[in-house]
């Protein structure tokens, strides 16, 4: 796994240039999960947030899923999205995760800006200081390319990092996909 990640880090510039424009299918899921919510905030009762909290005052209070087709061009910047399906559960209070453009994250940089925090990319130049990598397996995509599935594990609990999986194309060392969640203290 370390060799795969090193190759992906070494190929970042090449792969960023190769993806000046693309079309892709996009799926996103966003949720707000609350742990141990207080009874009141600034003297105002929270209740059970519309039935989203259990007896320990923990629960998912908002869930949004979207499937869309996106087209992206880097220069000049152009982004188009056609939403195929969208489902929202809970009160959004004006907040929505239903747009792909809001999730336009660049993992080829050293950090990824998520929810007001810069998190260390798994293929950052300093990734090995923050992550442990484990090769979980490989598979061939429909174009016959070998895809490596690499588990991404934070080394420390308090770092602003991700946890999950990154998929890297063999020989090109490009990111094929990600399945990551923000981890650590944000």
Residue ranges and their predicted role:
Residues 174-175:
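Hydrophobic "anchor" residues
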Residues 164-168:
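Hydrophobic/aromatic beta-strand elements that line small-molecule binding cavities or substrate pockets
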């Amino acid at each position: 796994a370390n060799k795969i990640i090193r190759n992906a880090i070494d190929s970042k510039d090449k792969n960023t240039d190769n993806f000046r424009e693309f079309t892709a299918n996009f799926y996103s899921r966003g949720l707000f999960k609350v742990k141990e919510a207080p009874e009141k905030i600034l003297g105002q009762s929270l209740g059970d947030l519309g039935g989203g909290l259990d007896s320990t005052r923990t629960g998912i209070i908002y869930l949004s899923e979207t499937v869309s087709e996106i087209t992206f061009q880097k220069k000049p910047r152009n982004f188009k999205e056609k939403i195929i399906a969208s489902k929202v559960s809970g009160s959004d209070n004006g907040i929505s995760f239903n747009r792909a453009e809001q999730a336009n994250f660049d993992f080829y940089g050293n950090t990824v800006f998520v929810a007001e925090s810069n998190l260390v990319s798994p293929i950052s130049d300093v990734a090995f200081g923050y992550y442990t990598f484990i090769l979980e397996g490989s598979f061939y995509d429909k174009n016959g390319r070998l895809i490596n599935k690499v588990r991404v594990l934070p080394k420390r609990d308090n770092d602003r990092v991700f946890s999950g999986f990154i998929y890297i194309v063999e020989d090109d060392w490009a990111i094929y996909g990600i399945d990551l969640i923000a981890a650590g203290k944000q």
